[in-house]
């Protein structure tokens, strides 16, 4: 199992399906058996104690993502009074549902009617995509339907991240739905923010990043 510190409040685990089986669990346990999934979670947190200074006390947000060869588990300390105030909020997404759920969540959070009434014309929806390697970035740059996206490419802690911006005066829900669907074919949605990447990451290509990647590679 791999453990990565994302920031002060977030830890990312990666556990292969082989490692999962060696620990006495299977994929169905994670998706359909809450008791088993919580048992696996606390096993991972016990191992974390020896790797990182991260206290699991208090409310937590937990997100599990299914990859081809294993699982990514993000654990974030929740702010009291926020979504995690009940103390244990687990989000599990199967491989077939993951992309659709992410798109729906992104649109619901940023384009619900109540929120739009208070937004100005210059408001922008931000989406951060994480890549395993640069070849995936090159492949994405050649995809059709993304030619006009506002994108900036960063490197941070050995990985590549694409900051995609959707100005609300230029994109409607359908446009964003289509674009995000394509983006998620080449990478994973990241928990990092554009602010964090701008502060700690290294800019590889400024806007428009995908066009520049396609031009040079």
From Swiss-Prot:
Which molecular-function annotations from GO does this UniProt entry contain? protein-macromolecule adaptor activity
Entry-linked InterPro entries? MecA_C_sf (IPR038471), Neg-reg_MecA (IPR008681)
Q: Which Pfam families match?
A: MecA
The family classification in the record reads: Belongs to the MecA family.
Q: Mind telling me which PANTHER family this protein's record contains?
A: ADAPTER PROTEIN MECA, ADAPTER PROTEIN MECA 1
Q: What's the entry's take on its domains?
A: The N-terminal domain probably binds unfolded/aggregated proteins; the C-terminal domain interacts with ClpC.
Q: How does it assemble?
A: Homodimer.
The protein's role, per its UniProt record: Enables the recognition and targeting of unfolded and aggregated proteins to the ClpC protease or to other proteins involved in proteolysis.
Q: What is this protein called?
A: Adapter protein MecA
The source organism is: Listeria welshimeri serovar 6b (strain ATCC 35897 / DSM 20650 / CCUG 15529 / CIP 8149 / NCTC 11857 / SLCC 5334 / V8)
Query: Its encoding gene is what?
Result: mecA
């Amino acid at each position: 199992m791999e453990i990565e510190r994302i920031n002060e409040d977030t830890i990312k685990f990666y556990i292969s399906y082989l490692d999962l089986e060696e620990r006495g669990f299977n994929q169905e346990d994670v998706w359909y058996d809450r008791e088993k999934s919580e048992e696996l979670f606390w096993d991972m947190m016990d191992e974390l104690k020896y790797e990182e200074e991260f206290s699991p006390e208090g409310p937590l947000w937990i997100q599990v993502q299914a990859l081809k060869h294993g699982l990514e588990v993000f654990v974030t300390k929740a702010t009291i009074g926020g979504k995690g105030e009940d103390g244990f909020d687990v989000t599990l997404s199967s491989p077939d549902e993951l992309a659709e759920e992410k798109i729906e969540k992104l649109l619901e959070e940023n384009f619900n009617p109540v929120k739009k009434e208070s937004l100005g014309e210059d408001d922008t929806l931000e989406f951060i995509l994480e890549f395993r390697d640069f070849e995936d970035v090159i492949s994405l740059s050649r995809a059709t339907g993304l030619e006009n996206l506002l994108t900036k490419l960063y490197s941070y802690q050995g990985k590549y991240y694409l900051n995609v911006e959707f100005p609300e005066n230029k994109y409607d829900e359908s446009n964003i739905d289509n674009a995000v669907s394509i983006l998620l074919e080449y990478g994973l949605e990241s928990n990092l923010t554009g602010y964090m990447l701008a502060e700690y990451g290294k800019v590889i290509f400024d806007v428009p990043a995908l066009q520049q990647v396609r031009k040079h590679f």
